[in-house]
């Protein structure tokens, strides 16, 4: 957290506090906590994928310290849609408290169920759809249809005694959506008639003028490209973009080709989409990868993952000649039906070069309309602001330039400048008597998942440069296997944090007390012990030094 704000004080009686633990000044890790009358409601719980300067990291989670001490206060986790940056961290939250009600649409919950199955977690689901309302303690939620690049997306109105909040989630105003489900702007405008006290609004494309193209415009382009291909066609797209996959299938079948899904997430998501009726394709039009390799090249279309150059994705392995089932040849047509996420340029261009070296023809959005964004452009957001007429605005889901562009749009529609809150992750915004203001900040950092340690959640060393710039505290504890009983004094070591060798002595006593409380609570899982140690040291450092160095806990069982 770059801001230097004190912790927020006690919430004014009857007020509402909004704290984003992720999703601001970044695209990913979306998680927002609402507090009212001592109870909590969470909207979304997603991951961020690591950049090139974060080696050895598979996933980056929201920092959940803010809720770890208040798990029993959580009324529900409510989901806007099923993209990884909104649902990917759910298993890690449910590890802390498995019975948190998880509220979402049919398709979103189906994806969450698949994800949680990998972690042997069975969530408590509450399925909703647009037009419905649910009550969760002191919070009432109403759901609005939203058009986005994955099915069944929702915007969420949260009604509290402090006022009405509208969270758009990821939103677009496609007037010709392939699934026939446009964003419910009339419903949100009716909400504006009764008064929206705070709008949390998607900022992703706020700096792009005008209105974004419709998803329906991609289909004809894909049809033209497949029709003109003499050999095999491989289309890469996001595994959650069911409307895109449907258009690829429709074009392939119309041109006499059969379709095969490639990549674990693509196969899984399309299976779920078919089961729930979101994807329509006959069994006779689908083939497995092995059968696809035996067919004439001009009789097949492969739909695969790997649009962002992920090293282990299906397309990347094809480009390196390492895919166990598919061997690319000169004359294959590769269509990258996606946007280029900032930070992935080097990886994507590397895959394109490798494909070109093989002799394949590569088509991206730069050559033909093979992709459109799932986020509203500036002109669409103006429709939203003029319809909802919010009293206060908190731009979310975007980098600083996107957030500021969104703030400018809000101001242009008459929202007072002092009512537009440009917050950061960890910054608390209080809504009291219809007025929103920043009240302080809670410590937040990045929580890393290292795939080499299955299910491990914690801060890990990313490299000497990052350690020296941020500082870190390494904590080693030795406990008896099966009981969690400490067998030696905790050892703490810091670097880039404090030069005083005695600076961490109070933290040692804090860790000893935490270990004793964990033993008393019969906590024996080393992951839970590590989480408790990290939380304790992080809280002590934050309170004592107002710093957030990396906390690296190691639990040794003997």
From Swiss-Prot:
It catalyses: a beta-lactam + H2O = a substituted beta-amino acid. GO terms for biological process: rRNA processing. There is a cross-link at residue 502 (Isoglutamyl lysine isopeptide (Lys-Gln) (interchain with Q-Cter in protein Pup)). Zn(2+) 1 binds at residues 81, 83, 148, 170. It is found in: Cytoplasm. Residues 1-269 are annotated as: Not absolutely required for RNase activity. SUPFAM superfamilies: Metallo-hydrolase/oxidoreductase. Its cofactor is Zn(2+). Zn(2+) 2 binds at residues 85-86, 170, 397. It is an enzyme of class 3 (hydrolase). Binds up to 2 Zn(2+) ions per subunit. It is not clear if Zn(2+) or Mg(2+) is physiologically important. Both beta-lactamase and RNase activities are inhibited by chaperone DnaJ2. Keywords: Cytoplasm, Endonuclease, Exonuclease, Hydrolase, Isopeptide bond, Metal-binding, Nuclease, RNA-binding, rRNA processing, Ubl conjugation, Zinc. It comes from the Bacteria. Residues 451-558 are annotated as: Required for beta-lactamase activity. Substrate binds at residues 371-375. InterPro entries: Metallo-B-lactamas, RibonucZ/Hydroxyglut_hydro, RMMBL, RNase_J, RNase_J_2, RNase_J_b_CASP, RNase_J_bac, RNase_J_C. Pfam families: Lactamase_B_2 (PF12706), RMMBL (PF07521), RNase_J_b_CASP (PF22505), RNase_J_C (PF17770). GO terms for molecular function: 5'-3' RNA exonuclease activity; beta-lactamase activity; RNA binding; RNA endonuclease activity; zinc ion binding. One of its GO terms (cellular component) is cytoplasm. NCBIfam families: MG423. Belongs to the metallo-beta-lactamase superfamily. RNA-metabolizing metallo-beta-lactamase-like family. Bacterial RNase J subfamily. An RNase that has 5'-3' exonuclease and possible endonuclease activity. Involved in maturation of rRNA and in some organisms also mRNA maturation and/or decay. Has both beta-lactamase and RNase activity, but the physiological relevance of the beta-lactamase activity, i.e. whether it confers antibiotic resistance, has not been shown. Homodimer, may be a subunit of the RNA degradosome. Interacts with chaperone DnaJ2. This is Ribonuclease J. The lineage of its organism: Bacteria, Bacillati, Actinomycetota, Actinomycetes, Mycobacteriales. The gene is rnj.
């Amino acid at each position: 957290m770059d801001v230097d704000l004190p912790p927020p004080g006690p919430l004014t009686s009857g007020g509402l506090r909004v704290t984003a633990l992720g999703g601001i000044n970044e695209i990913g890790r979306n998680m927002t906590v609402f507090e009212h009358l001592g109870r909590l409601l969470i909207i979304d719980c997603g991951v961020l994928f690591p950049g090139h300067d974060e080696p050895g990291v598979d996933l980056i989670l929201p920092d959940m310290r803010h809720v770890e001490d208040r798990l029993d206060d959580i009324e529900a986790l409510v989901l806007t849609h099923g993209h990884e940056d909104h649902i990917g961290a759910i298993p890690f939250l449910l590890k802390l408290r498995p019975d948190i009600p998880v509220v979402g649409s049919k398709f979103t919950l189906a994806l969450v169920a698949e994800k949680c199955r990998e972690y042997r977690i069975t969530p408590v689901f509450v399925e909703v759809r647009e037009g419905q309302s649910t009550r969760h303690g002191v919070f009432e939620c109403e759901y609005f249809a939203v058009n986005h690049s994955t099915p069944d997306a929702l915007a969420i109105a949260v009604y509290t005694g402090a006022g009405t909040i509208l969270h758009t989630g990821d939103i677009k105003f496609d007037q010709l959506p392939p699934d026939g489900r446009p964003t419910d702007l009339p419903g949100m405008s009716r909400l504006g008639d009764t008064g929206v006290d705070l709008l949390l609004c998607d900022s992703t494309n706020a700096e792009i003028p005008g209105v974004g193209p419709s998803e329906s415009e991609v289909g004809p382009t894909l049809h033209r490209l497949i029709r003109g291909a003499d050999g095999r066609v491989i289309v890469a797209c996001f595994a959650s973009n069911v409307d895109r996959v449907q258009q690829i299938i429709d074009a392939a079948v119309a041109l006499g080709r059969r379709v095969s899904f490639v990549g674990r997430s693509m196969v899984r998501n399309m299976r779920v989409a078919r089961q729930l009726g979101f994807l329509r394709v006959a069994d006779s039009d689908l083939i497995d990868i092995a059968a696809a390799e035996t067919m004439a090249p001009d009789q097949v279309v492969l739909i695969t993952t790997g649009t962002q150059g992920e090293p282990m994705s299906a397309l990347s392995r094809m480009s390196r000649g390492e895919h166990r089932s598919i061997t690319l040849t000169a004359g294959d047509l590769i269509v990258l039906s996606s946007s280029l996420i900032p930070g992935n340029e080097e990886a994507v261009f590397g895959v394109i070069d490798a494909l070109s070296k093989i002799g394949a023809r590569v088509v991206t959005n730069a050559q033909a309309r093979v992709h459109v964004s799932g986020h509203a452009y500036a002109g669409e957001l103006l429709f939203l602001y003029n319809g909802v007429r919010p009293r206060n605005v908190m731009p979310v889901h975007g980098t600083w330039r996107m957030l500021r562009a969104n703030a400018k749009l809000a101001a242009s529609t008459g929202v007072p400048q002092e009512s537009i809150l440009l917050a950061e992750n960890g910054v608390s915004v209080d809504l009291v008597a219809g007025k929103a203001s920043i009240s302080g900040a809670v410590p937040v950092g990045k929580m890393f998942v290292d795939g080499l340690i299955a299910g491990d959640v914690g801060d890990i060393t990313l490299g000497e440069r990052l350690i020296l710039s941020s500082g870190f505290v390494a904590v080693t504890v030795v406990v008896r296997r099966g009981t969690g009983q400490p067998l030696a004094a905790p050892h703490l070591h810091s670097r880039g944090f404090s030069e005083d060798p005695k600076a961490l002595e109070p933290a040692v006593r804090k860790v000893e007390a935490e270990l004793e409380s964990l033993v008393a609570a019969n906590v024996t899982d080393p992951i839970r012990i590590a989480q408790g140690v990290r939380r304790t040291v992080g809280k002590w450092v934050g309170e004592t030094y107002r710093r957030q160095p990396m906390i690296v806990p190691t639990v040794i069982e003997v």
